[in-house]
Amino acid sequence: MMSNSSSEIDVIKTRIPTYDEDDNTILYAYETKPEFVNKEPNIVSDASCNTEEQLKTVDDVLIHCQVIYDALQNLDKKIDVIRRKVSKIQRFHARSLWTNHKRYGYKKHSYRLVKKLKLQKMKKNEVYETFSYPESYSPTLPVSRRENNSPSNLPRPSFCMEEYQRAELEEDPILSRTPSPVHPSDFSEHNCQPYYASDGATYGSSSGLCLGNPRADSIHNTYSTDHASAAPPSVTRSPVENDGYIEEGSITKHPSTWSVEAVVLFLKQTDPLALCPLVDLFRSHEIDGKALLLLTSDVLLKHLGVKLGTAVKLCYYIDRLKQGKCFEN
């Protein structure tokens, strides 16, 4: 008999035949349907498959998350490296700007200070060295006294020959015994004429001998007799340099008063091979005597683009010019 819990839908009923004809008993055989038998195991297998798939999915997600995390860590490291490099570049750029700005300001300040000191010194020298005469016997420039340490063997455009004669008179023991005071009125009344040596060459004006001295004629005669064969010192120069000295009247005793062309002439006459290439550069920058005295090797190399050897030579000549030795042999 089939249990009450089972239903006819889930079982297969089969009649069992009996071999006894008198027996009216009917027997049935009940079998469970195959679908119902395999139903529960299939559900279990499906659940296990779903669990495995879920585990695989979770593992894949975790693996991808780990990969993403590693990639983010690498990007973070690279960003740190880039940030350090950028900060280093910014610090270097800021340091260079600050250094250049500081040096520029310092040079500007020192340039103004040195320029002011040079102007004051030049004014003092002009006060000490200029004559007290109301008028000068030079047609173009006022005559200044020669310094004791200045070279006397080179004629300069700013000095007339009477200065050379006056220096010779001071050194002459015979003429030094007869000193005479100099008066502006006597000086303005006498006419200064050029004197001639025995060979007929004109050496200059005799105004150095007739500076208001009543005995100027006797002194002149004595001086011309004792020094008839003496000629003013000269320096062997090329024709170009001599022409430059004659044409350019702007080279004076004080380099701070030179014009741009006077500085160019100084470069040409000092060292033509090394300094002539700087002529156009000096003209373009309008470097006059004051600027020439303030030039340094740093300015020549960094701002003007002069080569090292040329800058060293020019600085050497500028130092000699400041010491008053640039015209010495």
From Swiss-Prot:
It is found in: Nucleus. Pfam families: SAM_1. One of its GO terms (molecular function) is histone binding. Keywords: Nucleus, Phosphoprotein, Repressor, Transcription, Transcription regulation. Residues 138-157 are annotated as: Disordered. The modification Phosphoserine is found at S138, S238. One of its GO terms (cellular component) is nucleus. Ubiquitous. Expressed in fetal and adult tissues. It comes from the Eukaryota. Residues 258-325 form the SAM domain. One of its GO terms (biological process) is negative regulation of DNA-templated transcription. Transmembrane segments: none annotated. InterPro entries: SAM, SAM/pointed_sf, SAM_Scm-like. Putative Polycomb group (PcG) protein. PcG proteins act by forming multiprotein complexes, which are required to maintain the transcriptionally repressive state of homeotic genes throughout development. May be involved in spermatogenesis during sexual maturation. Belongs to the SCM family. This is Sex comb on midleg-like protein 1. The gene is SCML1.
